[in-house]
Structure formats: C-alpha cells, structure tokens
C-alpha cells in the first residue's frame, strides 16, 4: 500500500506545537476592518489552539499522514 499523503489544505492552515496541541490562525482578518476596534484586530493577529479534542485529533490525522 502506498504512503498516505499529507492534506495540502490542512498543512497550510494548521501546525502542531511541541506539546502536541494544534495551532490555528483566526478568521475575520481580511477586509472591511474599519468598523473593528484596534483591540479586536490585535487579538485576531495571535494564533489560538484548537480546543475541541475531536477536532484536534482529526486535524492531526490529516497532518501526520
């Protein structure tokens, strides 16, 4: 059986931290940002951790194929 390929879309969107958690970037940062406060825009810059264990497990399966 051939090797499994890493999911191209997932590898562009997610990364796994050293402790094994899944890191992702936040949405709503592309356009029409004038109505958004500076604090909100700053908060959107920082990556966050995928909290749901089921989702994180599925993403890891796509990445570590």
From Swiss-Prot:
<dbReference type="InterPro" id="IPR001706">
    <property type="entry name" value="Ribosomal_bL35"/>
</dbReference>
<dbReference type="InterPro" id="IPR018265">
    <property type="entry name" value="Ribosomal_bL35_CS"/>
</dbReference>
<dbReference type="InterPro" id="IPR021137">
    <property type="entry name" value="Ribosomal_bL35-like"/>
</dbReference>
<dbReference type="GO" id="GO:0003735">
    <property type="term" value="F:structural constituent of ribosome"/>
</dbReference>
<comment type="similarity">
    <text>Belongs to the bacterial ribosomal protein bL35 family.</text>
</comment>
<keyword id="KW-0687">Ribonucleoprotein</keyword>
<feature type="compositionally biased region" description="Basic residues">
    <location>
        <begin position="1"/>
        <end position="14"/>
    </location>
</feature>
<keyword id="KW-0689">Ribosomal protein</keyword>
<dbReference type="InterPro" id="IPR037229">
    <property type="entry name" value="Ribosomal_bL35_sf"/>
</dbReference>
<dbReference type="Pfam" id="PF01632">
    <property type="entry name" value="Ribosomal_L35p"/>
</dbReference>
<feature type="region of interest" description="Disordered">
    <location>
        <begin position="1"/>
        <end position="20"/>
    </location>
</feature>
<dbReference type="GO" id="GO:0022625">
    <property type="term" value="C:cytosolic large ribosomal subunit"/>
</dbReference>
<protein>
    <recommendedName>
        <fullName>Large ribosomal subunit protein bL35</fullName>
    </recommendedName>
</protein>
<dbReference type="GO" id="GO:0006412">
    <property type="term" value="P:translation"/>
</dbReference>
